[in-house]
Each structure stands twice: as C-alpha cells, then as structure tokens.
Amino acid sequence: MKYGKFLEEGGTIGFVAPSFGCNIEPYRTGFEQAQKKLQELGHKIWLGPNCYEGKGIGISNTPQLCGKELQEAYLSKESDVLISCGGGELMCEILDYVDFDRIKKADPKWYMGYSDNTNMTFLLTTLCDTASIYGPCAPAFGMNPWHPAIDDAYLVLTGKKRVLNGYNGWEKESLKDEEHPTEPYHITEEKVLHTFAGAEKVIHAQMQGRLIGGCMDCLVNLTGTKYDKVNEFTEKYKEDGFIWFLESCDL
C-alpha cells in the first residue's frame, strides 16, 4: 500500500470541495478561521476553485467541475495534502469525471474528509491501494478551542502521532450555528463501547487488522459498481485481517 508524505512545517494544505462547499454560514467563517489557524501553525494554503461555490445540487458545483477540481488537485504539485471542505449528498455523481487510473499511478497524497467523502477515502484505499484519512473536514479546524479529536487529526496529518485513543464523550446536539460558527464540540454524552463475539458479549476484546470503511450511505451506492474492488482488496491483504468502521447518516 502507498502512503502519502506527511505535512511538514511550511508545507501546503490544499482544500477542495467535491461535496458541499463553504459558501454559507457557519461553514464559511469556520473555514476562514481554519485557514488562519493553519497558517499560524506555519502552513501555506491552496484553495480549489469550488471551495466557496454553492451552485450544485448536493455538491458545490456540477459533477464535471467537482471531478475536475478533485483530480487536478490530487495530481498537482501545488499542495502536499488535501482536506475536503465538507460532506454532502451527491459526491457519487462526480466519480465518472475522475480518472482513478491516473490517481493510482500518481505520487500518493494524504486526503482527509468524512461522510460523503467516503467516495474518495474508500476508493483511494480499495481502488488505488493508497492510504487515506477518514477525519474532520476543513471548517472543523476553525473551532476554538480545538477538541482533542481535531488536534489528533492534525497530528496524524503531520506524522507526529501514530497511535490514537478514544475520547471520553461525544456530541449529540451541536451548538454551532450561523451566529456561533467556531463553537467547539458540545460533549454531553458518555462513551459506551460494546464488543461481541457472535452473540456473546466480550468484556476485554482485542482485535487487529486494516481499517477500512466509511459512510454506509455511500458504500451502498458503490456496491456492485465498477468502483467496487473490495473483493480484490480484501484478498490481497487477507493475512492482515480487517476492521470495518461504519458511519450511519440516513440509513
């Protein structure tokens, strides 16, 4: 498997919007604050043409233009890593406008995003044999202060952290809105983990394997299409085992 180079001090972070852009609040201000914060940390910024667009349906622009932006940004030497501007609804429509053969042959580059970005993170891994990061989108880096999860995402991107642990709780209702675009996560719910071996509950579970997965809504759409190379991927790495992570949006 190929791994991108970690983001160095002075390196350039590229932002793309293959799903929603940051054209409305609270995402616009969050995105602008994220750029400011990352520049303060010593990085340069490169913006794709769709970052502030809202012309598309369920995505920032037309599928053709979103696909063009994503492909050109990944192949370009102008950025060292890529972070998506947001999730959305119809990123699946851009896939026919992305040349995954060229991406597979290109120098690997870290791509970070979640939700609708499964259409890139999952395919980079299973189709292009390139590691990706299922993590926060651009506006989250504008929250003040950073939650440990945001700090960890940055440290993973820079290669300064290779081992991650869970967090004490999770957000059920966000306080972020148009008037409070940089609110941090509103942690109110306790973390509870359950592990099972078949129908039997296991108290102390250990497992190992390659992490693959993403948003189930996106994975369902990819199943059985020409982009579905999961069988080949799992066969190639079957000795390693697999740990699936699954996010449920509307399913």
Region locations from a protein language model:
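ATP/NTP phosphate-donor binding region
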Residues: 1-78
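Long, hydrophobic/aromatic-enriched structural stretches that serve as scaffold segments
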Residues: 75-98
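Short, acidic/small-residue loops that bind anionic groups at enzyme active sites
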Residues: 98-124, 131-139
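Hydrophobic structural segments
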Residues: 123, 212, 217-219, 232, ...
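Conserved anion/nucleotide-ligand pocket segment
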Residues: 131-217
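Internal helical hairpin/lid segments
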Residues: 224-251
